[in-house]
Amino acid sequence: MCTRYIPPDVAAIEREWHVGRHNQPDWARDMHPLYTGPFIRLDAGKTRELVVGQWGMIPGDSDTRIPMSKPRGPGEKPKRISTVNARTESVHSRPTFSSAWRQGQRCIVPAASFFEPNWESGKNVWWRFKRADGRPWGVAGLWDQWTDPATGEIVPNFTMLTLNANAHPLMKRMHRPEVDPKTKAPLPPEKQDKRSLVLLEAADADQWLNGSVESARALVRLTPVELFDAGPEVQASQGGLLL
């Protein structure tokens, strides 16, 4: 599950995907859930466009742009839910994501780098993931639009897709190990559900954005480990700059 990433600048997006901002608002330089960031989708004419929207899908019947669960019984209060990631195994059936999936509202989320927690030392150490060739990542995603019932504002929003990474030599090392709810002992590796973002090559952009559901699913695969430049996050001594 990814909850932080760094978007590229607009020049890098134009070079990689041949699409520009075209009067879109600016975006956050360090993305966290519910921040505003860029994503690439097809417009009504099936042409790529760069859109700026909220990271975190908003349920269509939500009263607020903060994703909340619906009360299940009398006296139960809504709870905030996480919609920044969607599992490819269940995206077709989850209420927040299924409509966008069925309607082919697929997008690409540009990322210069993203971050995942590593617990091998017994505590959380954030790792940063870049491409070894210096190009930006293209993260497979879904998009939607939500209309604010109070103001009528249309809010584009998006999520990133994930898949199981138990077999990946790098991504299986990320995230806190799951434990047995009864014994509290770590589950064996084959019982863990390690996750990875679905990462697309630029050459596959048209297939992802404009292909059938079947052709899009063919792109849901783990990324070869040699494409990664990954390691513990390093901050400069001045200003907390990421290196």
Regions found by a protein language model. Give the residues of each.
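Short linear sequence motif anchored by a di-proline
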Residues: M1-L243
